[in-house]
Amino acid sequence: MKKDLTNSRLDRQNILNNEMAIEEIQNKSGVEGIVWNNKLFVTREMTAKFFDVDVRTISRYLEQNGEELSENGYEVLRGKNLKSFLDAARNSGKDINVPTKTTVLGVFDFRAFLNMAMLLSESEKARALRQLMLDIVIDLINRKTGGGTKYINQRDKDFLFSSLQ
């Protein structure tokens, strides 16, 4: 199996745990949502529209990866939280197409939104966002290490031994 973000939970989590990378990705990606509790949130419908997939596709991924997405910021709003979120949406001027009688609403914070991008294999936009994420993470690593990273030549079985001589 090819190792990439769509099938490696560990690799996904490594990126999602990097707060500097998340902030940089949010600044460069141009994702628009609703700012609520000082965080950017998007609904399932907004997520589906961004990735050019059906809402049922997002729902299917939520069923299959609900635990992972919840750990990374997906939540179902009810009661006072829902009312507060809907007020924030109205104040932002964004129409999120939520009926007035809605009692629950699933929302992704930006981290969970990126997690969904890493899971979605059907979307070209998700693939492009994954590439942007990897480019930003590699760039941050390069900046933190002073410019470049060194790789061990894994093809040469005697490399480690000879480098210690």
Question: What are the language-model segments listed below?
Answer:
Residues M1-R60, L77-Q165:
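Positively charged, aromatic-accented nucleic-acid-binding surfaces
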Residues Y61, N65:
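Residues in the recognition helix of alpha-helical DNA-binding motifs
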Residues E67-G73, A126-R127:
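Cytochrome P450 catalytic domain signature, combining two hallmark sequence patches
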